[in-house]
Amino acid sequence: MREKEQEREEQLMEDKKRKKEDKKKKEATQKVTEQKTKVPEVTKPSLSQPTAASPIGSSPSPPVNGGNNAKRVAVPNGQPPSAARYMPREVPPRFRCQQDHKVLLKRGQPPPPSCMLLGGGAGPPPCTAPGANPNNAQVTGALLQSESGTAPDSTLGGAAASNYANSTWGSGASSNNGTSPNPIHIWDKVIVDGSDMEEWPCIASKDTESSSENTTDNNSASNPGSEKSTLPGSTTSNKGKGSQCQSASSGNECNLGVWKSDPKAKSVQSSNSTTENNNGLGNWRNVSGQDRIGPGSGFSNFNPNSNPSAWPALVQEGTSRKGALETDNSNSSAQVSTVGQTSREQQSKMENAGVNFVVSGREQAQIHNTDGPKNGNTNSLNLSSPNPMENKGMPFGMGLGNTSRSTDAPSQSTGDRKTGSVGSWGAARGPSGTDTVSGQSNSGNNGNNGKEREDSWKGASVQKSTGSKNDSWDNNNRSTGGSWNFGPQDSNDNKWGEGNKMTSGVSQGEWKQPTGSDELKIGEWSGPNQPNSSTGAWDNQKGHPLPENQGNAQAPCWGRSSSSTGSEVGGQSTGSNHKAGSSDSHNSGRRSYRPTHPDCQAVLQTLLSRTDLDPRVLSNTGWGQTQIKQDTVWDIEEVPRPEGKSDKGTEGWESAATQTKNSGGWGDAPSQSNQMKSGWGELSASTEWKDPKNTGGWNDYKNNNSSNWGGGRPDEKTPSSWNENPSKDQGWGGGRQPNQGWSSGKNGWGEEVDQTKNSNWESSASKPVSGWGEGGQNEIGTWGNGGNASLASKGGWEDCKRSPAWNETGRQPNSWNKQHQQQQPPQQPPPPQPEASGSWGGPPPPPPGNVRPSNSSWSSGPQPATPKDEEPSGWEEPSPQSISRKMDIDDGTSAWGDPNSYNYKNVNLWDKNSQGGPAPREPNLPTPMTSKSASVWSKSTPPAPDNGTSAWGEPNESSPGWGEMDDTGASTTGWGNTPANAPNAMKPNSKSMQDGWGESDGPVTGARHPSWEEEEDGGVWNTTGSQGSASSHNSASWGQGGKKQMKCSLKGGNNDSWMNPLAKQFSNMGLLSQTEDNPSSKMDLSVGSLSDKKFDVDKRAMNLGDFNDIMRKDRSGFRPPNSKDMGTTDSGPYFEKLTLPFSNQDGCLGDEAPCSPFSPSPSYKLSPSGSTLPNVSLGAIGTGLNPQNFAARQGGSHGLFGNSTAQSRGLHTPVQPLNSSPSLRAQVPPQFISPQVSASMLKQFPNSGLSPGLFNVGPQLSPQQIAMLSQLPQIPQFQLACQLLLQQQQQQQLLQNQRKISQAVRQQQEQQLARMVSALQQQQQQQQRQPGMKHSPSHPVGPKPHLDNMVPNALNVGLPDLQTKGPIPGYGSGFSSGGMDYGMVGGKEAGTESRFKQWTSMMEGLPSVATQEANMHKNGAIVAPGKTRGGSPYNQFDIIPGDTLGGHTGPAGDSWLPAKSPPTNKIGSKSSNASWPPEFQPGVPWKGIQNIDPESDPYVTPGSVLGGTATSPIVDTDHQLLRDNTTGSNSSLNTSLPSPGAWPYSASDNSFTNVHSTSAKFPDYKSTWSPDPIGHNPTHLSNKMWKNHISSRNTTPLPRPPPGLTNPKPSSPWSSTAPRSVRGWGTQDSRLASASTWSDGGSVRPSYWLVLHNLTPQIDGSTLRTICMQHGPLLTFHLNLTQGTALIRYSTKQEAAKAQTALHMCVLGNTTILAEFATDDEVSRFLAQAQPPTPAATPSAPAAGWQSLETGQNQSDPVGPALNLFGGSTGLGQWSSSAGGSSGADLAGASLWGPPNYSSSLWGVPTVEDPHRMGSPAPLLPGDLLGGGSDSI
């Protein structure tokens, strides 16, 4: 009986216990759930909890303090709730991680050791359970079985997830996946309060009781300090392994318990482990652990080393980690001790150790212990995972000597990681290396096992390239990627190979294999990995899809990284990484999986608790969130790593990456690099890539990538490219493309190939990446494709790369890619620009920064950029895109802002890391540049929508010069695609602007682009921009030429390479005769008439470019926000194109740095590039500008003047000879200018027209302007004065380059200069205007001829030398394609005109050149070019004025200004461009145009006349229009719309400007518009103007809508074809032809419909309606405030006319309403596309921008027509949507933009008639841009 009673009692007791346990479980679950709910709170509480919960908890306390870790720790605790806690993906990864972690920890359960292992991420209990469970569930019991390994794996996954998603548990929970329950159970079981001794005796003993083994572990784990000491206790390690688990677990016991079974295994493991640990682990640890630490550094977040501040704990951890054993233990120990951090770190370390194994072992599970290796391997992998870098790196790095790559990937990804890679990585990664080596030793590891590890690793690692580790790894495959490679290679297949697969497999494979025993694990890894596989992992990040995440992570290894770590791993990797680290650790440890649960827990805990983890790391937000599969790509980075060069770009990138590492931005990606690594890395293609770049190409890149892909890895060029591309995701994609090689390439990636398969990539990569993947996929495909060639070439990368295909194709496909590719190749090949490749990869090494995109954005900007436009934003989007942005993605501003800094440094983080890199990258790759752009842009492109951009971009996308460039370029360029850059983001886009711009504008784009790109930077611009200019046309062109070249020369030779040829040519021309270097000289040279012309051209180019920028900017409005994108892009694309060559030097475009702001660099770049830059016509600019640019660039400024000068940040860039350019630039470039100008200023610029830019450029401008002035041969004295000024300004600029001069000062200077110029120009214009003017390069008369011949012709004209010069020739072709620009440039001397004119030409297909005079004047050239189209001398002017770049006009402002002194004042004041007559002030309604009698007005310049009001040709239709245009142009602000200029009514200009700025300018408009004024009569003229200018955007039809707009007929024509046919708008000629149309449309004849533009959202619709009703009953009142337009129909035309008169320029609220007549056609169009379309139409932004611009500007016909002219076709189609949306006018505009021909190609509509047209649209765009842009801006 008694026995029974006892039994009963016992039973009761048991029941009670059970209930108690259940209760606890429930509570824990609830807690977790609650915590989940209250994540924020949970974070800290959780942390506390864990501390309290278990000894470990206490130990972890510090980690808790760590904050991030703490949070994570909490999460692990929260694990049980895994299922519940399964964090919805929607939670931003960053938060998610934190929350989740917190939650887990919060669970209250002490984070079990496994948790610790996970780094806290995973949750202790779940460690096994969750991890194992989930994994098990997936993987199965095996995992569980090998709890340690498994759990870790799963945990890892979980951790990863957790980190990201909180999946940690989730992973386990990830988990929660299906296994949740299990995990929960396990969790339950596992999770025990430290206090829960009863339940968890283990735990209870955990501290004291844990087995001795445990104890040891515990101790070591428990106390971080201890840990350290434990470290020494490698022995502990033995236990450690087992112990590890234990240790890891908070409750060792728990762990043990959980591990229990493990323990034995563990023991075995332990011993092995220990050995391993010591050995491998040690090694790893060293590597990993240490690395961890170091790598942690890499992890950035993880390692204190890396980010001590970020992860204070980490530091500890590192220390803790010291002991290899400890590391092992560390898992557990760490948990305890640093708990999350240490644990994590240690774990990482462990992992590292594992990795070491992995390296070897991993490679095989082999390494010493199977177990160990497995474990270790796992660890290793894990490491990878957690430290993908590490892991990967290790493996990679290790494996590879890539290390670098590896490192890159991981390293890059994670600083720590890299370090982690440590040896390899480290080696590769410098820092990493350091870390690695030192890092390895870094932390205790180093000391401890570090040595071993170090040795082991180090050798290899360090060797990095070598095999050592490699070997070991290699065994894995040294392939370079080696490690990864191997992995990827298949190698191992599995191993990473598999994993690599996507990397996914990456770990997977690796894991798989390695796990060997760990089959499960493997499975787990595999499974999860696989699925998650990288993807998963990525997913993880992305979705942190499963615990697998871990696997994933692993796979992704970074997959995980990807996932959680993903990003962390990846660039951000830190978090992720760390997470990954954690995970990794887990994985690793887990892998060891012996002690699964504990391990998991420990790992989780560790992970979670890791203080060292930066939450950002965990978060997937920036990057991570994106989950771009960048990781994967990043992997590639690895390879590059080795390449030192990579570093270069990479550097930037790397840095970025590294830096980014945390960053998120690309870094992240890079971090991912790990991942990438895997994928890439692996591939790394290194090989392939390698070849190209380093193998690194990819690898390099990879590394870079890691860094940023493009990172370029360093530059990798490809990476660059891709990086760039990747830079944003897209970039990636793109990058990929380039990769293509990757992908396809190798297969280029080889593995990637797999991917390359696209799939692989895609899959792996892509997938998330999508951008990549997607893009990638696409990209890949694209890459491949785009890569197109890439693919094609498998080497693709290389090949492709090499091939222009890339360029081309890439471009095409991916612009970026293509571009990249091309560029890259070129770049690559040319080292000059290797950079090119380098651009991406190459020279950019630094450039990679260039790549900015790549890097940053691109990478982030990277965006990835996959060309994909896909991501649209890519750059930007993603950040910015990543971007950029995203990381610090500068919006580009930075990048350019800092020209000097440029160095790639900046900015964009993108470049930051690579900033330079990217840019250079771009430059390097010119194509790539483009590509980049494209890619990025492309990617961006999606973003493309940037406002008009999109339209542009898109259409551009294709071929049209614009398009193409645009597209790609744009996308690349930014415009098109994007979006712009950023980032995109990278970038980045996005970049659309860039793209579009770039593209479109070739020149503009170029200019802008690069600028945009930041030219770089970012790549985004770079991309496009870089590509930009020419690119614009051809993206490649831009991208290519520009970027690449620029970079090299710019950056590299700065002046030399590119400079030399240019200089030579200039010298020949006399322009540059004195000194390339010397801006002064240059300027002086320019003094000569030739010079003048050239300058003019320069100016023009600049202007154009600038304008473009502006235009783009404005136009896009979109970009503006992103300075980087916008500014850069804007400027860049055009400029880039234009200046690509310069870009090269500057890298502005190419480089991004100096150039970035202005495309000019790119232009030059382009030129070298040769013809891809059709737009390089800008080349003309380049030509004109080039000299200056040379000087400027040499000066350090950005290339072309425009770019450079205006903005060139660093360079004082005399380039700005043309005022207008600066103006233009000011408008757009400001962003580019950013270095010199603040973003806000930039924003103003658009409004101001050129002033800010001008001023910004200030000294730059001055010199440029001066040069321009000096160009005015008719004013010798003036020339002398100008020379003096130039000298002064050069000096000033030097200062300014340093950004020392305040904007205000600069502005003042510029204003003064502008005024001088204005006056002089006015005189000149008048003189020239008369016949002279005509003679001015009107010749480029044939729009196309102009364009086509432009190079030769235009060049001949003023720039024969230029022409001769390579770049120009490049331009030539570019020009040809760009046609317009070149012509503009060339004709107008291509200089001033070039930008504007080019743009205009481009848009309109007219030769801008004609307006040399205009050029001379202000932007006269700019104006002229536009007009040139018409063919009449004034045509140029028309163009200029029309300038369709109205905005350009701004820059052209000079020309414009003078013409409209008064108007200028109004707007001008704002712009404060001296060039512009004061009367034209941006904010003020312009009164001037209307009153100005061109004949009598002293201020009138051809440009200002627009139609040549003052000019005798006024009679000329063109002239008249021109004069109006000019006036409008004067608005310059309205850069976006040349049409204002084109339109007689200055309002137009004003509208632009104002529209931008808002109506201030419009009033003038109004008058101007009076129906008759230029209206009908000039209709013809107008027409012409419009045609030319159409872009001019008659924003203020006012009295009379732009010709045609009002007229239904014209409308039709415009809309339909007339314009089209004429293409007036649509076609460049069209304008002329349009004349009749115009006349029709022109007829201002009032219609029943009135379109009100420039409305702001603040306007009260009812009030507006009431006001409108005062003039008559409204039959229709359609208000679209989003577009800033209102479409009103009166019952009679009289009422409509009355209302128009009353409403036009009416100030309502905070805006000035522009009222224009709209034809039924336009209206229908407007209505049809109005709202929806607008947004839809290119970008909604653009739409908005356009629309609003258009609307605003086009409000009435004027706008419309202008638009029509402009974008007419496009407009409508594209713009149309945007514009269309606007209103009838808009419609017209729409049509302008959209469908209508015109830009058709450019714009969208293809009216493609003229690709050159592209230019036209550009000009148009600018006008519109201005308006819209301003708005946007």
UniProtKB/Swiss-Prot annotation:
<dbReference type="InterPro" id="IPR035979">
    <property type="entry name" value="RBD_domain_sf"/>
</dbReference>
<feature type="compositionally biased region" description="Low complexity">
    <location>
        <begin position="1321"/>
        <end position="1330"/>
    </location>
</feature>
<keyword id="KW-0225">Disease variant</keyword>
<keyword id="KW-0694">RNA-binding</keyword>
<comment type="similarity">
    <text>Belongs to the GW182 family.</text>
</comment>
<feature type="compositionally biased region" description="Low complexity">
    <location>
        <begin position="379"/>
        <end position="388"/>
    </location>
</feature>
<feature type="region of interest" description="Disordered">
    <location>
        <begin position="367"/>
        <end position="1046"/>
    </location>
</feature>
<feature type="compositionally biased region" description="Polar residues">
    <location>
        <begin position="1627"/>
        <end position="1638"/>
    </location>
</feature>
<feature type="modified residue" description="Phosphoserine">
    <location>
        <position position="1432"/>
    </location>
</feature>
<dbReference type="InterPro" id="IPR019486">
    <property type="entry name" value="Argonaute_hook_dom"/>
</dbReference>
<dbReference type="Pfam" id="PF10427">
    <property type="entry name" value="Ago_hook"/>
</dbReference>
<feature type="compositionally biased region" description="Polar residues">
    <location>
        <begin position="756"/>
        <end position="767"/>
    </location>
</feature>
<feature type="compositionally biased region" description="Polar residues">
    <location>
        <begin position="969"/>
        <end position="993"/>
    </location>
</feature>
<feature type="compositionally biased region" description="Polar residues">
    <location>
        <begin position="401"/>
        <end position="414"/>
    </location>
</feature>
<feature type="region of interest" description="Disordered">
    <location>
        <begin position="1193"/>
        <end position="1212"/>
    </location>
</feature>
<feature type="region of interest" description="Silencing domain; interaction with CNOT1 and PAN3">
    <location>
        <begin position="1218"/>
        <end position="1723"/>
    </location>
</feature>
<feature type="domain" description="RRM">
    <location>
        <begin position="1648"/>
        <end position="1720"/>
    </location>
</feature>
<feature type="compositionally biased region" description="Polar residues">
    <location>
        <begin position="927"/>
        <end position="941"/>
    </location>
</feature>
<dbReference type="GO" id="GO:0005654">
    <property type="term" value="C:nucleoplasm"/>
</dbReference>
<keyword id="KW-1268">Autism spectrum disorder</keyword>
<comment type="subunit">
    <text>Interacts with AGO1, AGO2, AGO3 and AGO4. Interacts with CNOT1; the interaction mediates the association with the CCR4-NOT complex. Interacts with PAN3; the interaction mediates the association with the PAN complex. Interacts with MOV10; the interaction is direct and RNA-dependent.</text>
</comment>
<feature type="modified residue" description="Phosphoserine">
    <location>
        <position position="1832"/>
    </location>
</feature>
<feature type="compositionally biased region" description="Polar residues">
    <location>
        <begin position="224"/>
        <end position="253"/>
    </location>
</feature>
<comment type="function">
    <text>Plays a role in RNA-mediated gene silencing by both micro-RNAs (miRNAs) and short interfering RNAs (siRNAs). Required for miRNA-dependent translational repression and siRNA-dependent endonucleolytic cleavage of complementary mRNAs by argonaute family proteins. As scaffolding protein associates with argonaute proteins bound to partially complementary mRNAs and simultaneously can recruit CCR4-NOT and PAN deadenylase complexes.</text>
</comment>
<feature type="compositionally biased region" description="Gly residues">
    <location>
        <begin position="772"/>
        <end position="787"/>
    </location>
</feature>
<dbReference type="GO" id="GO:0005829">
    <property type="term" value="C:cytosol"/>
</dbReference>
<keyword id="KW-0991">Intellectual disability</keyword>
<dbReference type="GO" id="GO:0000932">
    <property type="term" value="C:P-body"/>
</dbReference>
<dbReference type="GO" id="GO:0035195">
    <property type="term" value="P:miRNA-mediated post-transcriptional gene silencing"/>
</dbReference>
<feature type="compositionally biased region" description="Polar residues">
    <location>
        <begin position="267"/>
        <end position="289"/>
    </location>
</feature>
<dbReference type="InterPro" id="IPR052068">
    <property type="entry name" value="GW182_domain"/>
</dbReference>
<feature type="compositionally biased region" description="Low complexity">
    <location>
        <begin position="211"/>
        <end position="223"/>
    </location>
</feature>
<feature type="compositionally biased region" description="Low complexity">
    <location>
        <begin position="1025"/>
        <end position="1038"/>
    </location>
</feature>
<keyword id="KW-0943">RNA-mediated gene silencing</keyword>
<dbReference type="InterPro" id="IPR032226">
    <property type="entry name" value="TNRC6_PABC-bd"/>
</dbReference>
<keyword id="KW-0810">Translation regulation</keyword>
<feature type="region of interest" description="Disordered">
    <location>
        <begin position="1809"/>
        <end position="1833"/>
    </location>
</feature>
<feature type="compositionally biased region" description="Polar residues">
    <location>
        <begin position="327"/>
        <end position="345"/>
    </location>
</feature>
<feature type="compositionally biased region" description="Low complexity">
    <location>
        <begin position="52"/>
        <end position="70"/>
    </location>
</feature>
<feature type="compositionally biased region" description="Polar residues">
    <location>
        <begin position="618"/>
        <end position="630"/>
    </location>
</feature>
<feature type="region of interest" description="Disordered">
    <location>
        <begin position="126"/>
        <end position="164"/>
    </location>
</feature>
<feature type="compositionally biased region" description="Polar residues">
    <location>
        <begin position="143"/>
        <end position="153"/>
    </location>
</feature>
